[in-house]
Amino acid sequence: MNKNTILTISKSIIIILILLAVVFALKAPAADLPVLNNDIKGEYVDSSGLPYFSEMDSYYNLRLTQDYADHGYVGDKMINGSEWDMHRYAPDGNKINYELGIVYLTNWLHDVANSVFGGNYSIKEVAFWTGAIISTLAVIPAYIFSRRLTNDLGAIVATLLIVLAPNYFAHTFPGFFDTDMFYYIFSLFFIFFFVETIRADNIIWKVVFAVLSILSIGLFSQSWTGYIFYIGLMGIFSIVYLIACYFFNIGDDKSDYPSKLSWLLHQDALLSIVILGIIGFAGLAVFKGIDGVFGIFGSLTGLLSLQSASRVVGGFPNVLVSVAEMQMPSLLGSGITSAFLANTNGVVNGIGGISILFAGLIVLYVLVSRSFKFRSVKDVVRTTGKPQKGNRLSAAKKIDNDRRFKLSLADLKFGGNNEILADKRLTVLYATLFVVWIVITALAVSRGSRFITTIVLPFALLTGIFVSFASDYVKNRLEDDRWLLVIVCLCGFLAALPLAAINNIFGIALFLVIIAVGVVAIYGIKPNAATKVPLKKYVVIAAIAIALVTPTVCGAYLTSETVVPGTSDSMWNAMQWINETQSNDTVITSWWDFGYLFEIAADKQVTFDGGSQTGSRAFWLGQAMTTDNLELSAGIFRMLDTTGERATEALVNITGDSGKSVHILIDILPKSSSDAQKTLVDKYNLNSQQAAYVVNFTHPENPRPVIFVASSDMLQKAGWWTYFGAWNFENQSSVNYNYYVPTSQVTVKPGQTGNLSILDSGGMDIRAVIERGTGNNTTAAHVEALNSATGEKLKLNDSEYNPLKASNLIVIEDGYLMKNESIKGAEDGNFTLFLMGNSNQYTPILMSNELENSMFTRLFLLGGAGQDVFTNVHSENGVMLYQVNFNNTVAGGASSSNSTA
């Protein structure tokens, strides 16, 4: 290894180390919660001083990691050799079928932290930082892959675009403990070594690269379910590449073979793919088992069907429609400047902004057009003999040249039509790879925003190549100083705009600095005749690189600076109260979002959580919270949390109709067991044996204790839980009902009038107008719809228009219900205005009329007054815990209950 080779390798290592430091430095501030004031920051920090995790999946991973550290396996029980989690999906729990790479790695890091560094770190402390540390290591494969295609600067740009990609960064900062951390590391290594297997001329190197590729995907398979996406991607690429080899005359001349099949069997590309296939089957069999390998195709089709949010499952609604990451993403965020920003608001924003989109598409066009130009050119025959000594390149130069993908912007007619010098086989190889990669990931993105992370990779790598193109073009073809200045000005604008979104002064300063440096370099410094490339061109190239990465860097900075944990002391303390006071067989029921947190903080089983949500459970929980019949709500909890889905399954087996089965259950759940059984026989024509069998599940003799959690976040989520609860089984559709909650309060003293915006959207400002008299019980209120720009009342055909008109008013002042009446002159409204006042501070909440007497409204907003089925046993700020009193229900043996509105 000569001096130049050592310098080349050393330079790459230094660049990687610098990039690692930069990326981690951008992630680390998230741990300090800088967006929160010190006076409220304490609400989001646990008793150990560590911020709460940022989302609920982290708590599931943390609990499994702690399980493994505690008793050597994940979950709570070993049943027939399988690990079972008894904290989930009451009453039966779940067999754990989860990639445990995150568990094994975190436990290993925990051991290293305490043994090597001599610390006394908890699993939770290590887990808090694991995502940020591991995801930062994606710098290594990103730089290696991109440096294979472009120059140093292009590789730096591509690496930053990948590792700081908005959707990836938003899931990998400190306090986000999920499997996303592995995503780019293994996918990049898998594809890189896959392509290197095809590129290699030596059979030994083909095998080595194939082994490394399969090792990467094998480790990926232990870390994230979505690994099968990349197996499918590269499988499709392999087929398309073989077709491209034939179409573009890659390899041996087709005329030398008697048939297409004979030609194909003798191609180097086929040999590479066969090697990958054989090693891949054997390698994945080691990681996933033979059945796992054969099940990959089914898993691929299942993954795609899973993303179809409108798909109805067994007659019940698909709960995935309520998962944000499963929604069809927007192309761009809102606002004129949005196209130039990097964030999670749209697909283009997710890849780094409009500049990255155009840069990537330009390079893709070059690759494809070059491939077609090459079609009539015979593939170069590779020789193994050494050139004459005087014509040999240094090892370092050969390594650098071999790593670069030699193309020029001349292909775009910028600066001339120079003869194409690139390698035909590589051009077709990478053209095929990136076309397939972008098409498949674009299709995936159409199935949900979670796949935006997949489309980042090809566009980032193509942008890295673009930097190399631009560098060559500026150095060799662009001589007009005026055009150099135009490029500098454009780049200054593109770089300053995202920084201005953080701080206007900084944005303007960056723009002026780039322009000033550009002007001085172009017009103020005379070129040195001894210098092959003048300084001004390096300044222009640097400006291009800065313009491309600044949106992504600024987006990462904003994300890190605005992190707010996914929970607070209120919810955690409420769960701790359950843990300390309730029996071990207690089930916690609520909407699924906080299920993972309930499991770890309360150490109790839950009805469902973020990984066990089903359409059936979503319907029943939504029905329980939407109905005005608290007997039905209690009956649903009694059934689900003690016998699970057995009653539904039994009736579906009898009737063959899930909708009819649900209708029957809604009818019998509020009744006594004897009346329920009689109803099944007399009204629904079941025989006595069938009726007794069903009632055994709907009315279990010893129902498990149930705590219902009502929290403020569920107000904003009402649109979803009412959607599921109001599901129409006949036409397979639904409607949703909402609460509209303001972001602040308004002060209204006696004798005064105040107003507060409840909703400001689409040019419409919905305001609650509150009028207070000077006597007792003289507070009145109504809702107005105003033009956001002018403040005037909205009109339609010269008549006042208010789509959120309130027809009913509920007033609670200082904890007492003062009014529950109709609003005069607004009888045609579809909403109820709930007004809560305390010490002259008023909070108006607008709700659909269908929610006025709903179980959730009665418990959370009205405090459970006027009923005895649910008892408020504990409260924290924004969190109320209700014990279900089954003995006070008709089904529980009471003659009657105070349950209906």
Residue locations for each model-derived region?
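Extracytoplasmic
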Residues: L17, A21-P51, S58, H71, ...
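Hydrophobic/aromatic-rich transmembrane helices and adjacent perimembrane loops
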Residues: F229, G448-E479, N504-I525
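Alpha-helical transmembrane segments at the extracellular/periplasmic loop-to-helix junctions
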Residues: A285-K288, S305-S376, F405-S408, V428-A431, ...
